[in-house]
Amino acid sequence: QNFISDGKYKTLQKSFINEVSRISENNKIILIYPIPEVGWNVVIQMNKFIQNLKFPNDLNEFHSAFEKSTLITTDYKIYQERTESSFNLLDSLKGKNIYRVYPHKLFCDKTIKGRCITHDSNNIFYVDDHHPSSKGAKMINDLIMKEIEKIEHKSY
């Protein structure tokens, strides 16, 4: 299957690998791995939970689940299965100027074993089913900035 009309490379993946490899010969590159997708709109789901509460008992249960980050989670194994080909492609890129950032490590298999969280006790990390909220984006940006700092530190 040919994804490139000029025939320069046989597939989109091969084209990506070759171009990133070529660019990385003289430039540092940070590869950002896939961000977990939730599969449903987190904010809408949160609102549904709140609207369906029967006070006061459900409020305590809701608050407890929210505090433990367990209210809305996704299966880490499904994330791994869905992103396997992306990981394989990015992992195939080698070179001294290639660096990696793994946003899923912020959300998956950390707070809750085998699950990817969508919130903590104070923040919601998604604005819909797969786009990070300002807080989620800041967390990912902080990971990227840490990687940039490591790269700069190595350069001195």
Model-derived segments and spans:
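Extracellular glycan-modifying ectodomains
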Residues: 1-156
